[in-house]
Amino acid sequence: MLGPIGHLAALAAYGFRRGAQVRHDLDAHRELAWAQAGVAELPRGLEIQWLGTAGFRLSYQGQHLLIDPYLTRLPLGDLLRRRVVRADAARLAALPDPIAILVGHTHFDHALDVPALAARAGCPVYGSRSLAHLMALHDHAERAVVVEPHHPYELGPFTVTFIPSKHAKLAGGLWVPYGGELTCEHVDALTPQAYKCGQVWGLHIAVAGVTIYHQGSCDLIEDALVHRGVDVLLCGISGRRFTARYVNRLLRALAPKLVVPHHFDDFFRPLDAPLTMNLNVNLAGFVDEVGAVSREFAVRTLGLGEAVGGPP
């Protein structure tokens, strides 16, 4: 794995080839489109929707589960100016009321919209102590469930287990930006930088006879991954270059039948803007990395806001 200087050099090289790389990634995204695969990989009645970034909606039997929903998508300028950003209720209106919301960690691109969604739906949210603190800031402390590792939570038709995980060290491979616990003392101080990472969780979900694993950040604790042979791996890929052998280790631990990459989009652009790629995410390269582990792993992509389901 590269050191800090190597990462800086790689970023500089990306700057020169960015246009070509983005086009290559968009081509790969189109070629791997799940809707064009012609294979019904989900059971009847189960639907998966990508909400952009690491966000997903899972629906079964008329009940909905949200994972890391982030539709507000603040502009980059708001991050740089450290502006307090509120959840965009108009954008959140596109989502159905969930029975629960699951949060893998509390960076803004995973947690900013959660209090507003939970308040609207009157549903519980499951995650870390940092998430509970965030909910308390919004006067919804009673809706927060601080989870226990490896404990199965029965949420309607879904059985959810939280798996201890780690966040990629995006700062040149040295540290996690905005790491530590979320300790902000007032909602008026909730700048993007105030959304500290908190405890990181992977999510194992069983529903309709299939298993789904959501990996929201590009690092892992291999000894914690006890669910081998999952049906669908929702695999975050942004920042994986900062974690040694991330793809290899994750795939060998989980042995998924299907891999669905996410967290490769530029999440500073609104959801209704054309898809473009996050900084140096290299989606096409990810496909090669999966193939290097085994050609038996199928890779499928979803478009922003796209939903796929089992046979009618």
Spans of features found by a protein language model:
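Pre-active-site segment of Zn-dependent metallo-hydrolases
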Residues: 33-40, 60-103, 107, 112-116, ...
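Active-site beta-strand termini and strand-to-loop segments that position acidic
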Residues: 58-61, 155-156, 205-208
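Active-site neighborhood of phospho(di)ester-bond hydrolases with catalytic His/Asp-centered motifs
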Residues: 67-70, 97-107, 126-129, 213-218, ...
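Active-site environment of divalent metal-dependent phosphoester hydrolases
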Residues: 74, 106-112, 132-135, 151-153, ...
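Active-site HxH/HxHxD metal-binding segment of metal-dependent hydrolases
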Residues: 87-175
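Short, conserved loop/helix-junction motifs that constitute active-site signature segments
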Residues: 94-96, 117-121, 226-229, 250-255
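Binuclear metal-ion centers of metallo-dependent hydrolases, dominated by the metallo-beta-lactamase
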Residues: 124, 136-152, 248, 252, ...
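Active-site-proximal loop/helix segments of hydrolase catalytic cores
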Residues: 188-253
